[in-house]
């Protein structure tokens, strides 16, 4: 039974890393949003499984929060925002997909080596989850760094919190009040970012961050 528990937890956490890798090669905003929704769904399953393994009922609520807000509400709202803004659907990247994927593989390997070496005495399941969580965090940062479009950078930010939740639940859960506060903080940040994107669109007729850099350069002159 313990082997089965470990295998399922390992599969779900590894699936989260795999979906994070999928985000790296998406070249259209709608596809990126759909992959983020899948990312949050896999997180929901992982947290729910940890709730079962640890006999921690509050983690079921955490899983429900991830499902409702991250897998449904936020992706749907961003889909509507893209339509209303008339944003260009294709994503411009700083570097090509090939180098980005290679960098992603390198970051995953780095996360595994670092985390497994610094937690030799930890529970094997917790060690794996922490290593996978660090991989998700690093891949989310890579998505943000390699995208020019502000919306795609916002989507790259969202998996960072998913990685934090995976780490916390793998390390014997987290207080429900913390997860609720994090969820509401993300929603508030999402609303602010939405308003900000509308203002960018009104002012510059684009949400490409290069337009902001050009504007700042002109002001300095």
Model regions and ranges:
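Alpha-helical transmembrane segments of multi-pass membrane proteins predominantly involved
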Residues: 1-221
């Amino acid at each position: 039974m313990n082997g089965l528990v470990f295998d399922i937890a390992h599969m779900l956490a590894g699936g989260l890393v795999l979906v994070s890798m999928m985000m790296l090669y998406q070249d259209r905003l709608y596809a990126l949003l759909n992959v983020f929704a899948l990312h949050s769904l896999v997180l929901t399953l992982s947290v729910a499984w940890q709730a079962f393994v640890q006999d921690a009922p509050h983690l079921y609520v955490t899983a429900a929060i991830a499902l409702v807000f991250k897998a449904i509400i936020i992706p749907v709202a961003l889909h509507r925002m893209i339509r209303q803004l008339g944003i260009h659907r294709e994503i411009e990247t700083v570097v090509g997909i090939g180098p980005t994927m290679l960098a992603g593989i390198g970051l995953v390997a780095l996360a595994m080596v670092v985390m497994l070496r610094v937690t030799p005495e930890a529970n094997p399941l917790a060690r794996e989850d922490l290593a996978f969580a660090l991989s998700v965090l690093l891949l989310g940062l890579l998505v943000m760094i390699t995208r020019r479009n502000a919306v795609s950078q916002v989507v790259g930010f969202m998996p960072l919190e998913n990685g934090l939740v995976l780490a916390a639940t793998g390390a014997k859960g987290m207080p429900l009040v913390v997860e609720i506060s994090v969820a509401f903080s993300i929603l508030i940040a999402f609303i602010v970012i939405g308003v900000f994107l509308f203002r960018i669109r009104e002012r510059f007729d684009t949400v490409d961050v290069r337009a902001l850099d050009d504007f700042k350069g002109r002001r300095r002159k």
